[in-house]
Amino acid sequence: MDCGMENCNGGISNGDVLGKHEKLIIDTDPGIDDSMAILMAFQTPELEILGLTTVFGNVSTQDATRNALLLCEIAGFPDVPVAEGSSEPLKGGIPRVADFVHGKNGLGDVSLPPPSRKKSEKSAAEFLDEKVEEYPGEVTILALGPLTNLALAIKRDSSFASKVKKIVILGGAFFSLGNVNPAAEANIYGDPEAADVVFTSGADITVVGINITTQLKLSDDDLLELGNCKGKHSKLISDMCKFYRDWHVKSDGVYGVYLHDPVSFVAVVRPDLFTYKKGVVRVETQGICVGHTLMDQGLKRWNGSNPWVGYSPISVAWTVDVEGVLEYVKAKLMKP
């Protein structure tokens, strides 16, 4: 297996590395940084957003659905369907909800009116399966929360992994500290069983871990500039980020905000701004390291079978053009 470094370059150095009307579904738990990524996506004319699917994580699934509906309306795309997903992990139990990071409403406790329209009658897994069946080989999924909905879609349709074009995932901490505990990143920790199902499904997967996303932040000066500019959504995002920024100061000593979800969105539209390594990734589902993502880089020939053998490798973001990604994100967030 060749697990060397690769640069996924779409051949375009400026702008979005996409054809017209690239089909995208965003699986999300909005969430302040999710909101940034979603609004950026709606401001990318090369994308045809087929829908949003919702999951627990930054908020409960019900609140994620409300926020997704609101964001579609704020972006000016009220007819984009929002399909509600699972309210609990694959194995059941109480979901982990990080409202202490994103505020009780998930949007930094900024007061917004309720959405004017309702969610889809389809579940998230049904919606994902139907769209991938309708457009085989054409649909990219950007997964910004726990991977429960994708795992359920795979379990519903065994051909899902072969029909989806690509899955780009925010998740994992590769050879670095987690952000829930020393071992695990929040999205994977939220449903480790689901993550392992997805990572071993055989789908074309790119995963962007927090070892990448924590290299990029909006500083206090950037946030001030965002709030004062004439961007279409910049004032709203700036207001949301006040709560988010205060949590970063208390939790990490960071005077600003990390750009986890926006960076993962950039991996969809500008993959050339990252380098990748390929390898099989498994997720620990028990013990003190539950949620830990461990990659076999193919550096050693094992003498016997092990839990990594026999699965397809995925692409793990390895390095990032920090300046290039920041420039792209700020341009999108400040776009009139």
Swiss-Prot record:
It catalyses: uridine + H2O = D-ribose + uracil; xanthosine + H2O = D-ribose + xanthine; inosine + H2O = hypoxanthine + D-ribose; adenosine + H2O = D-ribose + adenine. Its EC number is 3.2.2.3, 3.2.2.7, 3.2.2.2, 3.2.2.-. The active site is at D29, H260. It comes from the Eukaryota. InterPro entries: Inosine/uridine_hydrolase_dom, IUNH, Ribo_hydro-like. GO terms for biological process: purine nucleoside catabolic process; uridine catabolic process. GO terms for cellular component: cytosol. It is an enzyme of class 3 (hydrolase). SUPFAM superfamilies: Nucleoside hydrolase. Expressed ubiquitously in leaves, flowers, stems, pollen cells, root tip meristem and root vasculature. Its main location: cytoplasm. It is found in: Cytoplasm. Keywords: Cytoplasm, Glycosidase, Hydrolase. GO terms for molecular function: adenosine nucleosidase activity; identical protein binding; inosine nucleosidase activity; protein heterodimerization activity; protein homodimerization activity; uridine nucleosidase activity; xanthosine nucleotidase activity. Disruption phenotype: Normal seedling germination and plant growth and development in standard conditions, despite an abnormal accumulation in the roots of uridine and of other pyrimidine metabolites as well as of xanthosine, but no accumulation of inosine. Accelerated senescence accompanied by marked accumulation of uridine and xanthosine under conditions of prolonged darkness leading to pale green/yellow plants due to increased chlorophyll degradation. The roots of the double mutant urh1 urh2 accumulates strong levels of xanthosine. Belongs to the IUNH family. Involved in purine and pyrimidine breakdown rather than in pyrimidine salvage, especially in response to dark stress. Together with URH2, required for efficient inosine and xanthosine hydrolytic activities. Unable to use cytidine as a substrate. Can use uridine, inosine, adenosine as well as the cytokinin derivative isopentenyladenine-riboside as substrates. Also hydrolyzes xanthosine with high efficiency. PANTHER family: INOSINE-URIDINE PREFERRING NUCLEOSIDE HYDROLASE, URIDINE NUCLEOSIDASE 1. Homodimer. Component of the NSH heterocomplex made of URH1/NSH1 and URH2/NSH2 which exhibits strong xanthosine nucleosidase activity. Interacts with URH2. This is Uridine nucleosidase 1.
